[in-house]
Amino acid sequence: MLTLGNLSPQEGSTKQRKRLGRGPGSGHGKTAGRGHKGFKSRSGSGIKPGFEGGQMPLQRRLPKRGFTNIFKKEFSLVALSQLDKFEAGVVVSPAELVEAGMVKKGTLIKILANGEITKAVTVKVDKISSQAKAQIEAAGGTVVLTEVTAAE
């Protein structure tokens, strides 16, 4: 019987680790692949990422650009083709979209006109594109825009 205690990897699927500094017969003895003397042969050596030998590093030569807008609102995008999965006559609110796994809880929601919608649904969202609104209303549905706050 196969249990966690007797699991083993498939034959040939794993390599043995390279044992360095274990005598001349191994082919990796004495200097253990580090060459002779010098900074890089010592333990604890190695330059930091981004160090360019004293030359001004690239991340300091390039200028700083832009800023982060702390008032920016991030929207979760939902396509019309996703809304078509709901039954006709249903009120599609942020809670329903979270339950269906289309958006994460606590995000703002915007509907985009990707795909087609054939069912008449009432949509309650924070934002909607003009084409998406036109398609929903053409299918017999309605659009209710909520105040721009995060979904419960």
Curated annotation (Swiss-Prot):
Keywords: Ribonucleoprotein, Ribosomal protein, RNA-binding, rRNA-binding. Transmembrane segments: none annotated. Residues 1-13 have a biased composition (Polar residues). GO terms for cellular component: cytosolic large ribosomal subunit. It comes from the Bacteria. Residues 31-40 have a biased composition (Basic residues). GO terms for biological process: translation. One of its GO terms (molecular function) is rRNA binding. The keyword rRNA-binding applies. Residues 1-62 are annotated as: Disordered. Pfam families: Ribosomal_L27A. PANTHER family: 50S RIBOSOMAL PROTEIN L15, LARGE RIBOSOMAL SUBUNIT PROTEIN UL15M. Binds to the 23S rRNA. Belongs to the universal ribosomal protein uL15 family. Part of the 50S ribosomal subunit. This is Large ribosomal subunit protein uL15. It comes from Desulfotalea psychrophila (strain LSv54 / DSM 12343). The gene is rplO.
